[in-house]
C-alpha cells in the first residue's frame, strides 16, 4: 500500500512494509528483531518490558503491536505513525540547525566586540604616541559596537 501525507506545504510519500511473518506474536517478533533492537517480542516479554519502546519509531511500534493486519484503522495508525516520525525527524533537524546558527552568531558577536576593543586600544595608543587620531576608534563607536553586539545576540 502506498501512502502520502502533506503538512504545511511539504509532501511525503512512502510504501507500507509487507507483512512480517505469521499472525500474532510470530509476526511481531520478526518486526521487533528486524528493527535492530536485538530482542524479539518474546524475549522482551520474558524480561517484562516492551521491546525497545524508547528507541523505536512510531511506525515500528504500530507494526509491532498490529503485525500484518490490514484493516482501515491499522492503515490509519500506520499513516499517523509515519507522520509523527516525520515530525520528530524535522524537529531533530531544526534543533541541529539552531545549534549551528547559535554557534556562528556567538562567534561573530565575540569577534565584533573583541575586534572593536582592539581597534579602540590601538587607536588610543597611536593617538597618544604620534598625535594621529583614528576616527573609527573613539568611545562613541565603541559604545555603538557593544550595543550592536548585544542586539545581534539577544534579538
From Swiss-Prot:
Ranges for the region named Disordered are 1-50
- Lineage: superkingdom: Viruses
InterPro entries with a match to the protein in the record: Herpes_pp38
Keywords, sorted A to Z: Coiled coil
Q: Does the keyword Membrane apply?
A: no
Report biased composition (Basic and acidic residues) as residue ranges. 34-50
Q: Which Pfam families match?
A: Herpes_pp38 (PF04846)
Which stretches are annotated as coiled coil? 76-107
Q: What is the recorded name of this protein?
A: Phosphoprotein pp24
Q: Which gene encodes it?
A: MDV008
